[in-house]
Amino acid sequence: MRIALGIEYDGSGFAGWQWQNGKRTIQAEVERALSRVADAPVRVTCAGRTDAGVHAIEQVAHFDTESRRSERSWLLGANTALPEDVRILWVRETEPHFHARLSAIARYYRYEILNRPMRSALRPRQFTWCHAPLDVERMREGAAYLVGEHDFSSFRAQQCQSRSPFRRVHFLHVRREGERVIMEIAANAFVHHMVRNIAGVLMAVGAGKRDPAWVGELLAMRDRAKGGVTAPPDGLYLGGVCYPEEFGLARDAVFEHLPADARRYQPDDES
């Protein structure tokens, strides 16, 4: 039996999603809690392995089990065993061929910037702080260069192990809500540090340090060394994952902006 689940977490106190020997990780906590409910070892596979300090509004994962439990029992039992900074939001029995990572049509990330002279005393690790005033219109102009299918070599970490630097960005929105500047981006997949590198570049543009056209120039250079500063993980959230309707999983309203021809990432599509 294959089970899908949605997970929310505050990544501040974790070394990332993926299990690491001797370190606190989300995967380890989730597997421990589910194994307790199953009364047997459980191994989970997630849609996107977030780095240290990165949060999730809705991470999606799946696991296989022979233990028969109701969806409610999985949900309540696992949450009872989880620490306060991790919560399972929903549990669904799904198709045997569902795969949290490989079945995804798109992933959505949200980057939140606290744009004011002083840092936050209440939520210091839930925003990235920028004291310089940010011009959202300039950031939008720069963001427009990144929408579509491109070689994102200038925006991926040098240690990125992906076979291809090509990704398709479906949308990249920037808006202001009071003291916060919010960037929302959806793509068929992301290279390592892609969202944080884009955020760092757009913050430089918004602060007036660079012109919006610089974003297009960086894209054309295909050189990470020219790509500016990687923004901190604090403001980054995995917002949600979109799957084909056949799996019956609810979609975040943000995915209404996806193009009709959006499909899952295939590394062999790019050459």
UniProtKB/Swiss-Prot annotation:
EC number(s) stated in the UniProt entry for this protein: 5.4.99.12
Pfam families tied to this protein: PseudoU_synth_1 (PF01416)
GO MF term set: RNA binding; tRNA pseudouridine(38-40) synthase activity
Root EC class: isomerase
Annotated binding of substrate, by residue: 109
Catalytic activity line of the entry: uridine(38/39/40) in tRNA = pseudouridine(38/39/40) in tRNA
Catalytic residues as annotated in Swiss-Prot or TrEMBL: 51 (nucleophile)
GO biological process, one term: tRNA pseudouridine synthesis
Key words of the record: Isomerase, tRNA processing
Membrane-crossing residue ranges in chain numbering: none
CDD domains, alphabetized: PseudoU_synth_EcTruA
Subunit text: Homodimer.
Family: Belongs to the tRNA pseudouridine synthase TruA family.
Record function comment: Formation of pseudouridine at positions 38, 39 and 40 in the anticodon stem and loop of transfer RNAs.
Annotated protein name in UniProt: tRNA pseudouridine synthase A
Organism this protein belongs to: Methylococcus capsulatus (strain ATCC 33009 / NCIMB 11132 / Bath)
